[in-house]
Amino acid sequence: MTNLTLALDAMGGDFGPRITVPASLQALRLNPLLKIVLVGDKTQIDEYIASAEPAIKRRIEIKHTTEVVAMSDRPVHALRNRKQSSMRLAIELVRDGKAQACLSAGNTGALMAMSKVLLKTLPGIDRPALVSCLPAVNNTPVYLLDLGANISCDSETLFQFAVMGSVLCETVDKTVSPKVALLNVGIEEIKGNDQVQQAGQLLQQIPQINYTGFIEGDEIYSGNVDVIVCDGFVGNITLKTSEGIARLLIHQLKKSLSDGFFVKILAKIIAPRIRSLLNQMNPDHYNGASLIGLRGIVVKSHGCADEAAFLQAITLAVTEAQRRLPQMIEDRLESILLDINS
């Protein structure tokens, strides 16, 4: 394992340095080969690193700027007018080869726009996709993409997403020949719109991708597939609905376990199992969405992430950098395109 540098937008998200900096310190303690460049207001950042151990401080660099991309900024406005923002400067560090990955909890649209313009897409990729993992019944994650980077997609774009999702699953989770499916309104070949049907036909012609066909929404968490592909409109609604249901279940479970004396006693006895279950259901446990298809690594954290959730996103960015995800995607796509054209 070699040293690597992470560029971190310290000002992004709902809480800024109050969450991003302590999480960074935790990551540095866990990984002695990691260096982090904190991009943002030095005065605010210094407040949270003042008490850190000297050995940790030596692996922190601060790139000062007071400009921030607001959550209300439109992507085009941010791209044109936030050229000294903490988000943009963090991405530029990746572009210039001074960092191997970038992480931000800021404005998603602005992050996608800046990343695409500054880092460019890989050869053979038309659009980057936002991807994250969801829990499944067999305790293995299922990757869902796109989560909102592309509201509408043609069949070729969905095909490219399937290739990238497959490589991501292979690279991060070491899954051999991951099963890939297209999210649809039915499993029959006649179901769905033209884009989904045509994407399915394209994938059937590619033996390097383990395409299993269509999958319906009620099978997302079944564990029967490893990668699920859809356009960003469907994916974003699916993700947000899933997070809402998970929080509802956690709330209801906690409420049920606090009703009545004997129930409370039972809850204390089985507390470790309950905590494990709640952790598996908690959306924060899966924090971190990757913007894949770019020439560099960009990870998006939830804006409302707490310290533990933000640490999870840092871990994801580090893992993708260690395993050279963009290069893996480029190599696999080149191999597939060569086979198609031969």
From Swiss-Prot:
The protein's annotated pathway: Lipid metabolism; phospholipid metabolism
GO molecular function: phosphate:acyl-[acyl carrier protein] acyltransferase activity
A Pfam entry, by short name: FA_synthesis
Keyword Lipid biosynthesis assigned: yes
Entry's localization field: Cytoplasm
Enzyme class, broadest EC rank: transferase
UniProt xrefs under InterPro entries: FA_synthesis, Phospholipid_synth_PlsX-like
Keyword NAD among record annotations: no
GO annotations of cellular component type: cytoplasm
UniProtKB keywords: Cytoplasm, Lipid biosynthesis, Lipid metabolism, Phospholipid biosynthesis, Phospholipid metabolism, Transferase
EC number assigned by the record: 2.3.1.274
Gene Ontology BP, a term: phospholipid biosynthetic process
Catalytic function, reaction form: a fatty acyl-[ACP] + phosphate = an acyl phosphate + holo-[ACP]
Function: Catalyzes the reversible formation of acyl-phosphate (acyl-PO(4)) from acyl-[acyl-carrier-protein] (acyl-ACP). This enzyme utilizes acyl-ACP as fatty acyl donor, but not acyl-CoA.
Cross-referenced PANTHER family: FATTY ACID/PHOSPHOLIPID SYNTHESIS PROTEIN PLSX, PHOSPHATE ACYLTRANSFERASE
HAMAP family tied to this protein: PlsX
Oligomer status and interactors: Homodimer. Probably interacts with PlsY.
Similarity remark: Belongs to the PlsX family.
Protein's recorded name: Phosphate acyltransferase
Species for this entry: Shewanella pealeana (strain ATCC 700345 / ANG-SQ1)
Gene: plsX
